[in-house]
């Protein structure tokens, strides 16, 4: 069950993030820690990488907003980070960045049954996703792709 303060903290963090050109990716209040810890994950609204300086700058601004709000009355630690790289590929940038990496493609075939294929990511264009499966190129219609995720080599 989430902490009762979490919705208010999320609203505050979302507003502060938007005012600084960030989007809130996640927030957790870890009350089992001493002092409790508020973990906040941000990303740039533009999609640019989040730097350590971005996290430090946002920490100061959000810390001031938290103090002014008096939502957290006990001692707490504020941790700001970026979400890092997830294993799901979604943006064009993801597909460019991870070209040549091992992926698992979850898709629907011609009979509308779900299939999973593993191979090396070659390319994604407006119409197809291409992967290399043991030296053979497999083209999958983009509208049949359910999801693409990074895998470990040989997994």
Curated annotation (Swiss-Prot):
Keyword Transmembrane: no
Keyword list, A-Z: Cytoplasm, Ribosome biogenesis
Keyword Cytoplasm: yes
Localization annotation: Cytoplasm
GO CC field: cytosol
Pfam family, one: RimP_N
GO BP terms: ribosomal small subunit assembly; translation
Similarity field: Belongs to the RimP family.
Role summary: Required for maturation of 30S ribosomal subunits.
Protein name (record): Ribosome maturation factor RimP
Naturally occurring in which organism (per UniProt): Synechococcus sp. (strain CC9605)
């Amino acid at each position: 069950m989430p902490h009762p303060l979490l919705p208010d903290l999320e609203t505050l963090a979302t507003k502060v993030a938007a005012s600084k050109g960030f989007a809130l990716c996640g927030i957790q209040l870890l009350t089992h820690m001493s002092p409790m810890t508020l973990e906040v994950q941000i990303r740039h609204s533009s999609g640019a990488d989040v730097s350590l300086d971005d996290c430090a700058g946002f920490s100061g601004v959000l810390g001031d907003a938290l103090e002014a709000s008096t939502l957290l009355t006990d001692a707490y630690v504020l941790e700001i980070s970026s979400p890092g790289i997830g294993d799901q590929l979604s943006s064009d940038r993801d597909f460019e960045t991870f070209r040549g990496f091992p992926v698992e493609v979850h898709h629907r075939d011609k009979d509308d049954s779900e299939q999973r294929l593993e191979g090396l990511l070659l390319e994604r264009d407006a119409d197809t996703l291409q992967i290399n499966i043991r030296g053979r190129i497999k083209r999958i219609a983009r509208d049949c792709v359910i999801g693409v995720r990074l895998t470990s080599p040989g997994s």
